[in-house]
């Protein structure tokens, strides 16, 4: 059976339990041949949006023109609550991510995708959601914690040196830090206070280095930074163990402001794209 489907340029879609593929542009067609239990062959026009379950071998390339798919990765959720301190990490993440999603959804240049909803998939599964959607950029949102209540401020993790998307990842991280710094957030880091770090795992031990350390290492970084096929940055929005950070960045006003700053950095990233 041959089916011709016309689909609008920008759609909202939910990725839950099954993976979908998104072909981006303005007007075109998606032609599916269905035999038995959803065995599909896919043919897509030069310009078009369609949704269809497909094999990983047919995943789309990231868009080189708007609308861009931006993956928002809530770093914790479901039964994975993250750190529990003055506030709960997953609540900071969830509310900030939801506000960022709304900002991107209202902008015709972007199609936002959440890598998780109310479940707790592993980082590899969340990366697959972003990859299947053809994400051009990913931001993974977290909140920090420390046994020392004086620890405060913003930092983020770029894809480490030597990786495919390191330079673009670092550029995106710089744009985020610039937004946070302009908003008055304390920027963490070495004497240069870049706010950008790299993470490496040596067995169960994690090593954090500042971005001034440009040594190429083969050790794996955070899972979401390793498995996503686009530039990506993991942000630590604030310390939920520090009262001043919580008051500024872990309230409704704080979630709104952080989302606005991430959105501004995303806009700037693609402006330079």
PLM regions: where:
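N-terminal targeting leaders characterized by basic, low-complexity, disordered sequences
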Residues: 1-2
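Active-site-proximal helix/loop segments of hydrolytic enzymes
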Residues: 8-24, 28-62, 94-273
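Glycine- and acidic-residue-enriched helix-capping/strand-helix junction motifs
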Residues: 82-95
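Catalytic-core environment of secreted peptidases
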Residues: 61-85, 139
